[in-house]
């Protein structure tokens, strides 16, 4: 089954990538500017190379860290514990597997949605939408929901998770430019990797209390500083 899924994935994704990805302005029918044309401030930003020290001194960099780290920690922790949480509600393994499928499917669709919307709308509002979906899902999980509601909540978590990479990439590219995109993303990595402690904290709290209630309240509280930090993100 895994081989068949892998082959199907390659058969569908590779042709789409081949047809849609373009590597140069010429392939998109965009003419290169002549040497005499003026360069706007936005274009200068896109071509600027930021040093590591300059990146770390930028308020925007730390706003991104303090905004995305809580969100990734919250939905990542719940994602890792979705199966054992469902088992505490009496959900069997087959039903749990379907919940994970719902999460993954909605996450894929959400990536397309957030990627498209990031080109048109304020990134702060889109981040707020992603964070709100996660917060609503956490509140729902605190109510010991029915299986039908669990499917809805899994979809909300997937929607929230789907906004992570598209919004992170859009914010970095629009605030630091494409020339230093890799440098900024690379520097963000170690800070955002701290979210890996989230599932461990969830496990510890579950072992101490015998349920996920306190862990979920902690996840909800963690989202608050993320929402506050995003307010300070400069407009693009």
Give short role names for the model-derived ranges.
Residues 175-211:
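A late C-terminal transmembrane helix in Major Facilitator Superfamily
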Residues 122, 143-145:
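Helix-breaking motifs and short loop linkers at transmembrane-helix boundaries and internal kinks
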Residues 2-19, 216-232:
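Symmetry-related core transmembrane helices of the 12-TM Major Facilitator Superfamily/SLC fold
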Residues 163-176:
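Intracellular juxtamembrane helix-capping segments at the cytosolic ends
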Residues 22-49:
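Flexible cytoplasmic inter-helical loops of multi-pass small-molecule transporters
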Residues 148-156:
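Paired small-residue
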Residues 53-116, 202:
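Extracytoplasmic gate region of multi-pass secondary transporters
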Residues 125-139:
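Structural signature of the two symmetry-related core transmembrane helices
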């Amino acid at each position: 089954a895994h081989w068949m899924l892998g082959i199907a994935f390659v058969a569908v994704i590779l042709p789409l990538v081949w047809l849609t990805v373009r590597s140069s302005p010429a392939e998109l029918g965009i003419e290169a500017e002549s040497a005499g044309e003026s360069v706007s401030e936005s274009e200068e930003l896109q071509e600027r190379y930021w040093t590591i020290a300059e990146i770390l001194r930028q308020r925007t960099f730390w706003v991104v860290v303090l905004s995305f780290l809580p969100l990734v920690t919250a939905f990542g922790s719940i994602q890792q514990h979705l199966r054992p949480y469902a088992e505490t509600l009496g959900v069997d393994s087959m039903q749990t597997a379907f919940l994970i499928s719902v999460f993954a499917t909605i996450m894929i669709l959400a990536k397309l949605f957030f990627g498209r919307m990031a080109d048109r709308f304020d990134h702060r509002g889109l981040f707020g939408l992603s964070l709100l979906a996660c917060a609503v899902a956490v509140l729902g999980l605190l109510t010991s929901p029915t299986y039908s509601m669990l499917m809805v909540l899994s979809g909300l978590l997937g929607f929230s998770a789907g906004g992570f990479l598209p919004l992170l990439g859009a914010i970095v590219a629009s605030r630091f430019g494409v020339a230093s995109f890799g440098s900024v993303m690379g520097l963000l990595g170690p800070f955002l990797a701290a979210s890996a402690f989230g599932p461990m904290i969830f496990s510890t709290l579950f072992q101490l209390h015998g349920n996920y209630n306190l862990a979920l309240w902690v996840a909800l509280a963690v989202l608050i500083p993320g929402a506050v930090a995003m307010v300070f993100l400069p407009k693009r």
